[in-house]
Amino acid sequence: MKKIISIILFSLALFQTCGRIYAQDETFGKTSLRPKLKFEARLDYNNDNKNDDLSGIKGYIVDLKLEGDLSPRFSYKYRQRLNKPVKDATFFDATDWLYLTYKAHRNISLMAGKWIVAVGGWETEPAPIDIYQISEFCNNYSCYQWGFNVIFNTTNNQNQVYLQICESPFRKQYKASTGNGKEMWAYNALWIGNIDFFHAFYSANMMEYRPGKYLNFIALGNRFDLGRKVALDFDLQNRASRASDFFKDYTLSAQITYRPLPAFQCFAKISHDRNNTGNGSDPTVFDGTKLTRLGGGVEFFPLKNDNLRLHGHYSYSWGRNTNPDGVLRDGQSIVNVGLTWRMHILK
C-alpha cells in the first residue's frame, strides 16, 4: 500500500508541475506527423561447443520499429520482435519498447510505457540486433519493463538525467522460483553525460528481487573517444543487498573499437562476472560464480551505412558458473558469423 501511495503522489506532483510548465511555454513550433517504419533482420551461423541447440544456421532477430510524433509535444516509439516467443499468454512479452513521451518543456519530458530499465553501462546500450557478446549478468537480466520516466535535458543537449519507476526485472524470476506473481518494483536514476572525449552512462538503482527486498546497483559506464577512429569502453557494475556486499558481487567489462574506414570496424571485448556474497540475493550472477569471457570480431558494411552488415565474432569463456540455467560455461567456445539488413519502409 505504501508503494502505491508513493507512486500516486509522485504522479500527481509530476502532472501539477507539467501544468505550470505548459502555461509558461505553449509551443515548440511545427512538426511532421509522418511516421517512420523500419524492418530489421539478422541471420546467423553459430557454433557453440557447449550447446548444440544453439549451433547451426539460425534466424536471430526479426523486428519492426515504428516511431513518430502526434503533435509538437507528444511522440511515440514502438519496437516489436517478430521472432520472440510470446510467454504468459501476452503479446507484450515480445515488445521491447512501446511508450509515449510528452515534452513538457524544452528541458523536461515525461515518458510512460515499456522501455529499457535505466541501468548504466555501455554494455547494456546497444540494441539486441547489434550485440555479439555480453556478460553473464546481461544474459540473465530482463532489461525491458513497463514504467514511468521523468527526463531532464540540459539546454546544450550534453547531459540527460532519467528518474524511473518501473516493474522489477526480477519479477518473473521470482514467480518462476516461488509460483507467486507478486508486485515488485525498481527505482532508478540514470545520468548520460558528454564531456568532450568522455561519455558517461552512470546509474544508481534499487530493484526488488523479492517483495520488500532490494538489490542495489551502482553502474558506471565510461566511454573514451581516442581520436576519431578508436573508442574505449570500461564499465563497472556493483550489486549489493547489504553494505557488507560491496565489491563482492560485480561485473566488469571493457571493449575497444577501431573503425579505420566507414565500411569496416573491428573490436575486442572482455567481461568478468563474480559473486562472493554468500547470501543468494542476486538472480543474475549466482553466489560462487567467477567467470570471464574474452572475444573479438569484425563488421563490414558494403553500402557504407547500417542498411547491410556482415559480421564475424569469436569468444571463449572460462571459470565457474554456479547457475544451473546460466548461459556461459567453463571452456565455452562460440563462433558466430552473420548478416544483418535494415529496410526503411516509411521515412
Regions found by a protein language model. Name each.
Residues 162-213:
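Loop-centered beta-sheet repeat module
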Residues 25-45, 53-170, 193-194:
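Outer membrane beta-barrel
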Residues 147, 186-188, 219:
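Short glycine-rich loop/turn motifs
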Residues 34, 40-52, 88, 99, ...:
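Outer-membrane beta-barrel pore domains
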Residues 1-26:
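Bacterial Sec-dependent N-terminal signal peptides
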Residues 55-57, 93, 139, 180, ...:
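Aromatic-acidic/polar surface patches that form glycan- and anion
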Residues 135-142, 179-183, 271:
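Short, well-structured alpha-helical patches and their helix-loop capping segments
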